[in-house]
């Protein structure tokens, strides 16, 4: 087998920005930002906007996300696109 063909698989902390929940798991994703975990070890931390802790499908609750306005920006940008000349 070839060496150095697979990405590094290591423990990382995912930080859910919407709910503030952090969880430790393993992933090939890496980050220069680190955090000290409950066990005293330091791990890379990945910030995510939505995880199973904050997604309405998993929580059963409707939440308002602060990414509102994307549709309005899209419509404003392409308002005249495809119109008759």
Swiss-Prot record:
Q: Name one Pfam family in it.
A: Ribosomal_L31
A cellular component term from Gene Ontology for this protein is:
ribosome
Q: Which GO terms describe its molecular function?
A: structural constituent of ribosome
UniProt keywords, alphabetically: Ribonucleoprotein, Ribosomal protein
Q: Which Gene3D superfamilies does this chain map to?
A: Ribosomal protein L31
What's a BP term from Gene Ontology annotated to this protein?
Answer: translation
What the entry lists under NCBIfam families is as follows: L31, PRK01678.1
Family membership, please give it: Belongs to the bacterial ribosomal protein bL31 family. Type B subfamily.
Its subunit composition reads: Part of the 50S ribosomal subunit.
Protein name, please?
Large ribosomal subunit protein bL31B
Its lineage opens with: Bacteria, Bacillati, Actinomycetota, Actinomycetes, Micrococcales
């Amino acid at each position: 087998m070839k060496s150095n063909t697979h990405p590094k698989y290591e423990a990382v902390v995912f930080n859910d920005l919407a709910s503030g929940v952090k969880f430790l798991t393993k992933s090939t994703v890496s980050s220069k930002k680190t955090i000290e975990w409950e066990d005293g070890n330091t791990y890379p931390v990945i910030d995510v906007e939505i995880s199973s802790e904050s997604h309405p499908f998993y929580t059963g609750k409707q939440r308002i996300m602060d990414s509102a306005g994307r549709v309005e920006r899209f419509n404003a940008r392409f308002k005249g696109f495809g119109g008759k000349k």
